[in-house]
Regions:
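Hydrophobic residues within beta-strands of alpha/beta enzymes
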Residues: 31, 95, 123, 145-147
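Active-site lining segments that contact anionic ligands and/or coordinate catalytic metals
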Residues: 92, 120, 144, 163-165
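Residue-level recognition of the GNAT/N-acetyltransferase active site
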Residues: 126
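Flexible C-terminal active-site loop/helix
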Residues: 155-180
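Buried, small/hydrophobic-residue-enriched core segments of structured protein domains
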Residues: 1-118, 129-133, 139-140, 153-155, ...
């Protein structure tokens, strides 16, 4: 369903998909962002963001709500953008939020990004979004440039998807020890 659904959504006007197989089969532009597991597999949130910016400098979209959006996520994103992207002259970047009070958090994040000189940084929102939720958060004054809409776009309401979240609980170090 995801592969054909991504194609149908693209025909209907969606800009792209996180489903890379739809890109390979149908030419639907693939794009996306990091997962919470990416952030958690590093010793620090900043290290995860910096590494992502180094690996994907022209498409850096950082997931800023793994721990604390306003106290660490956005500040660490700004630091990574400043240290990795700005020296290369790259101004195209984004942050993504997929939990919490999206309207409030995006307003605060926009102010923080603007004050740090990242007016060009886009803000993306996701988290089981549909047209009603999007309309509601926009009515609340959310500062969202992009919406990541997936399951509610291509899944029948009468046969919904399983609403689960995957987060990394531990990693195995090179010496074989398991670290929570």
């Amino acid at each position: 369903a995801a592969i054909i659904g991504a194609r149908a959504a693209y025909i209907g006007g969606v800009a792209g998909t996180a489903c890379t197989i739809s890109d390979q089969i149908y030419g639907v532009p693939a794009g996306g962002t990091m997962a919470h597991a990416w952030v958690q597999m590093f010793d620090s949130e900043y290290e995860a963001f910096k590494t992502y910016c180094e690996v994907f400098p022209t498409n850096a979209t950082l997931l800023v709500d793994t721990y604390n959006t306003l106290k660490s996520g956005v500040p660490n994103a700004i630091k990574a953008f400043n240290e990795v992207l700005r020296p290369k002259g790259i101004t195209k970047c984004a942050i993504r939020l997929d939990s919490g009070d999206i309207a409030y958090l995006t307003r605060e994040a926009r102010q923080m990004l603007d004050e740090a000189g990242w007016e060009s940084c886009k803000i993306s929102a996701s988290n089981s979004l549909d047209e009603y939720i999007i309309q509601d958060i926009l009515r609340q004054g959310a500062k969202v440039d992009l919406f990541g809409v997936g399951e509610r776009m291509i899944t029948s309401k009468s046969d919904p998807v399983f609403g689960g979240v995957y987060k990394l609980a531990a990693i195995e170090k090179e010496d074989g020890t398991i670290v929570p």
